[in-house]
């Protein structure tokens, strides 16, 4: 039976996806933890980042604008293989999930009842071959091609070090119960949280919240830790 052109294209796309480096699959210990607390040491990694303040649920707000910038730059790097610009060491990759670092002034951890006071750094991880120079190229290219101001994007290398993490299943507003499990685990194992201006509440969003019911949302929650004195 003759295979249609559309079917051939579908097979080709599946093959291309199969060859793309997927951070979630290659680094399962960081992206797919169990639903019980575990301690991990997270190595330094490069990120595209945008900083901001305020309620992430605000329609037309800074958070949603930041996400648009992040994906514009990330996909410009991913799709550079289709243009004339060549990135040394390039390999194709699945754009990793959106992540966020969150804090509030004068609060240890997160006060979920007062979202308007959130400070955040929204990030997407990049392969190691993405240097500051390649990032700068991607920002300029995304701005030019997509007619979108991407100047708010930053290139960050983040070294999280020793952390506790867990897979949270459910709505974001239900996270306090999961965080309580993390805190209990730390206490039982002679650890404590180690929040600071550079070590923050970290979330990795594995579910597209627009396409799934809240009770199906999967979010990695990660906290910096240290041994109790």
Question: Where are the model-predicted features located?
Answer:
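A solvent-exposed interaction/effector surface
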Residues: 18-229
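Short, Lys/Arg-enriched N-terminal segments with co-localized hydrophobic residues
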Residues: 3-18
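Intrinsically disordered, low-complexity regions enriched in Ser/Pro/Gly/Gln/His and often acidic
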Residues: 2-3, 210
């Amino acid at each position: 039976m003759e295979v249609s052109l559309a079917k051939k294209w579908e097979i080709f796309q599946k093959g291309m996806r199969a060859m793309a480096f997927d951070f979630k699959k290659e680094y399962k210990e960081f992206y797919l933890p169990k639903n019980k607390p575990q301690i991990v040491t997270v190595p330094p990694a490069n990120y595209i980042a945008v900083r901001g303040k305020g309620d992430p649920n605000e329609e037309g707000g800074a958070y949603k604008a930041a996400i648009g910038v992040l994906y514009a730059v990330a996909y410009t790097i991913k799709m550079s293989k289709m243009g004339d610009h060549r990135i040394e060491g390039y390999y194709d990759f699945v754009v990793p999930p959106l992540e966020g670092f969150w804090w509030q002034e004068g609060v240890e951890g997160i006060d979920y009842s007062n979202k308007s006071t959130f400070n955040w750094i929204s990030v997407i991880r990049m392969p190691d071959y993405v240097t500051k120079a390649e990032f700068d190229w991607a920002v300029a290219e995304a701005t030019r091609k997509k007619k979108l101001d991407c100047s708010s994007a930053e290139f960050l290398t983040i070294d999280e070090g020793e952390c506790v993490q867990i897979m949270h299943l459910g709505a974001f507003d239900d996270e306090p119960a999961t965080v309580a499990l993390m805190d209990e685990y730390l206490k039982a194992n002679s650890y404590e949280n180690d929040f600071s201006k550079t070590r923050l509440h970290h979330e990795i969003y594995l579910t597209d919240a627009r396409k799934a019911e809240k009770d199906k949302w999967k979010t990695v929650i990660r906290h910096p830790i240290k041994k109790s004195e």
